[in-house]
């Protein structure tokens, strides 16, 4: 949703407006290289606010390449609601299996790009921060390497 990034990736793209995708939540999942990237996952009673773009066929091909379509992301038809309440049938990229099963934190630069996009388009960042918080909770907990040493020192483990 970052206007600067879209201008670079898709020179013909135009903002059509802010929209809400009901029945999905924002998530960060591993992109195959160990870094988290954004996707939407079905989840009742949730929503994702975002930006709807008008893109040319040329821009769609460029965006397909950037998004790793059809391997990393697939295209799914979704219904979004505009600020005026109008329902629109559109296409969204959604991460494919097995990638979407593995939570991963985004890089600082990637996250800043998303937050900048929110600011540029008047979208609240609360859902982005919630997705980060959920991702942190979904990650496997790392074992404390000092825990065993402390138990041994206290005579709890032999």
Show which residues each predicted segment covers.
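Glycine-aromatic micro-motifs
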Residues: 1-158
């Amino acid at each position: 949703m970052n206007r600067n990034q879209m201008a670079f990736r898709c020179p013909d793209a135009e903002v059509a407006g802010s929209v809400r995708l009901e029945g999905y939540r924002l998530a960060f999942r591993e992109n195959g290289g160990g870094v988290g990237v954004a996707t939407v996952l079905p989840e009742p009673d949730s929503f994702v606010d975002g930006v709807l773009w008008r893109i040319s066929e040329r821009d769609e091909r460029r965006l397909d390449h950037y998004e790793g379509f059809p391997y990393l992301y697939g295209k799914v038809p979704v219904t979004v609601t505009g600020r005026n309440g109008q329902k629109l049938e559109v296409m969204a990229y959604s991460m494919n299996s097995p990638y979407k099963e593995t939570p991963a934190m985004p890089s600082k630069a990637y996250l800043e790009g998303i937050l900048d996009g929110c600011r540029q388009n008047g979208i609240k960042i609360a859902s982005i921060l919630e997705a980060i918080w959920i991702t942190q909770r979904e990650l496997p907990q790392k074992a404390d390497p000092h825990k065993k040493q402390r138990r041994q020192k206290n005579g709890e483990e032999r």
